[in-house]
Every structure is written in structure tokens, then in C-alpha cells.
């Protein structure tokens, strides 16, 4: 059941003196876009009558087929709390439709919706809790972003050592004003690195929340004279930023990954889900780790995963099963980074896990030792493979995985791979 009707939104805009409404959507690479309308055009927007030029968005369509429609999702209506004065600004997240009023296959939100529908056909709801890390860097005298900070704080440090504490508090309060349930916030391992964790939700809401989270963090950081960076590895010699995703499936409101009688308290479905993720992980990596820079993070020595293995007892493998059981039982995938498109990340994770359940893919035994300390021969004996080592290898792995390509659809697969090949070629040409 929808939270808001069209009349609800029109009334809230009038009552709250909202002047501008951002019709937001996300491009193929996870960049937030918007068409802004004034309140006088709101009813037209809510009737799905707002158009934009899709050929201007990278990865969408050619100029000869450029007319596209924005279909607002009423339940995503939200008033931005950082502009409370006269003439407030609100937003609605939109789906993209073609000129003939069909869902656009290149819309990342549509890709996730399809995956969620596949899960629903099997009786499952896909719940996800992300762990979003970011850096707060200084701006230079011209107000341009840098990768510099005078801060030297570390894991769980507090002010006055933590120079970003006040900004982080404001981010938390702002996010709560926008309807987030913030579970924790703290300084991370590296200087100027932070994490804010919000409560899990069903997958589409979580992906929407990640996009909103990044916008709010960047906006509040700028108000504090800082630059919020979601780059996976902005500096050499320190831990990069990840976006771990904690995943579970529910059926009739019950977490089906939990089984008190099962091995490690896990159900067969949980093991099969892990098996599916491991089977398709190489093909998914260019989605979960989309930049040349992403692979600067995925190196030994900085707590980021490299090897395709799982464990319930240590954090060195790719997949971890946190200790909580019962309703909190979940599978944590540790490789995604915050530069990734959350809609595509959650879509490929869900469909890989569902493939594991459908085909009862049993994962290899859990790894109890530190994978980084194993010799090459020991890893080979255990069948432990590595993630792609760079963007070029990741592109090649997706090209080989027909299942993941089908999840993404022909349009996104073609345009995404084309763009990533160009990124790699540009990187190789740099001197």
C-alpha cells in the first residue's frame, strides 16, 4: 500500500511552502540527476507528463530516440531539511519511461525492480543494510575539493581529535529529519574517514536511501567547509572506503536464512545464497567495484577482501556471516565500494543469490584462517580464487558471465562495458 497519494503530495507542498520539486533519477553509473519543476507544475509532474532529453544522459539513448518520461514514485517524496526558509525544496525519485510509455530497460532502478519481482515470485523479500564509508577532506582557498586533511584520528576516536565530528553529527540529524533510522555513526580507521550506518530495509528503499544518503552527506559537508568523498581509495597508504552490504531474505515476515537446527545456525537457503554469490562474483565485480580506482582498494594490507571465500569467524574473506542469529541472520558482502550504482549492485547480488537457491549451489567449506596469510599453494588446494585485479579483468569477467549480463539486460550490459573499456583505455594512455 502506498504511503502517499497525489493529493497528499499536493497538500504537503502547499502547507509547507515548497517552491521547487526535484524529479530525481540515477544514471547507469550511479550519478544522481534531476529535472526541477516549480510547485505550479507539480500536478503535471505527478501525472507523468514531464519529459527530458535522454540522449544527454550517458548510457541512456541516441539522439534520434531521446524523448523520455519521468514517472514519480510518490512514496519517495521528501522535503530537504537543509533549506527550511521560504521556498523549500522537495524531491521525488522517478522511474524512467520511453516515449511509448514503456519502462526504460536502461534505468538502473528498473533493473532492481525486476530482480525484486523475481524474488517475490519465489515468495521472498530482499532486505539489505549498507555500511557506507566516506572521507571528509578540506577545500582549498578557491573552494575546490582536495584530498588533504589535518586530521589524524583513527578508529572510534572522538573530538577534538576527530575534526569531522560536528559535521557528522549534523549529517545524522539531517538524515533523521529525512526519515532515516540511524543505528550508529563513528570515525573509521583512516584519518578523516567516517561511517554512518542506517537501518536495513527492503532492497529498493535501501538503494533509494543510499542515493539520498550520499547527497545529504555531500551537502552538509559543504556547509561545514569540507568535501565529502566517496572515492574508494583517495590516498595511498591508508584504508579505502567500502560499502559492505548485509543481505537477508524474508518469507511471510520471517528471515529464512536462520535455522537453529542448521550448521552454524544457517538454513539451506543461506548456504545456497552464498554459493550463488561466489559462483557469479567475478562477473559481478565490475558492478560492485566500477572504477579504475576501486582496485587500488582491493589490495592486501588494508582490510579489503581479495579472495572469493566465506567465513563466520574472521573478516579476511569476501563474505562474512555476522554473529547475530535469528531475525538478524544475514550475509555480508564486503567488496562493494561507495562509487558503485546501488541499484545495480543490489540487483546482481540478489539474482546471484537466487540462482544459488534455484540450483542449490553449495558453497565450499568456510575458511577459518586468515586468507591473506595463506600460501598460494594452500589457497589453490582449497579452491580459493581471487577477485579481478583491475578494471580490465573485471570487464572481461562480466563478458563471460551470461547470467549476470541477462540480469543487467542487453542495453545496460552493452553501454556499461563500452564505457568501462573506454575508462581503462584512457587510464592506460595516461603518462
Can you annotate each of these PLM segments?
Residues 1-431:
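Glycine-rich, acidic/polar active-site loops that bind/position phosphate-bearing ligands
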